[in-house]
């Protein structure tokens, strides 16, 4: 006697695929965050992340700004490959800034989820007004 025929597993829906993709992306950034966080306070001669954090928040912000500008330049120039690389640099330096400031990826995901489904104009209008100076 042969084995009974089994039905193939149902194909995941696009929504399930999207959720899986979102989770994988969050996990990549979480792993990078965990790696950067593990470098905090370690020997700056052995880790670029440790060296940045040892130099202080102003240097971290400067590096983030430099990478953001490079990213924008590549976007404006239409250099897709370079834009991808510079985008990765921006994300890395953003995560270094998060670690230094005590912000976790979960803090940011929570804020993004709170904003989900709200129009950008309505969300921005609902923010408290900040005074400069």
Swiss-Prot record:
Family annotation (Gene3D superfamilies): MazG-like
Region annotation Disordered: where it falls in the sequence: 1-22
Classification lineage: Bacteria, Pseudomonadati, Pseudomonadota, Alphaproteobacteria, Acetobacterales
Main subcellular location of this protein, as a coarse class: cytoplasm
UniProt GO molecular function: ATP binding; phosphoribosyl-ATP diphosphatase activity
EC number(s) given by UniProt: 3.6.1.31
Alphabetically ordered keywords of this record: Amino-acid biosynthesis, ATP-binding, Cytoplasm, Histidine biosynthesis, Hydrolase, Nucleotide-binding
UniProt feature coiled coil, ranges: none
InterPro entries (UniProt xref): HisE, PRib-ATP_PPHydrolase-like
Catalytic activity: 1-(5-phospho-beta-D-ribosyl)-ATP + H2O = 1-(5-phospho-beta-D-ribosyl)-5'-AMP + diphosphate + H(+)
Gene: hisE
HAMAP family, per the entry: HisE
GO biological process: L-histidine biosynthetic process
CC per GO annotation: cytoplasm
One Pfam family, short name: PRA-PH
Protein name: Phosphoribosyl-ATP pyrophosphatase
Family: Belongs to the PRA-PH family.
Pathway in which the depicted protein is active: Amino-acid biosynthesis; L-histidine biosynthesis; L-histidine from 5-phospho-alpha-D-ribose 1-diphosphate: step 2/9
Localization per record: Cytoplasm
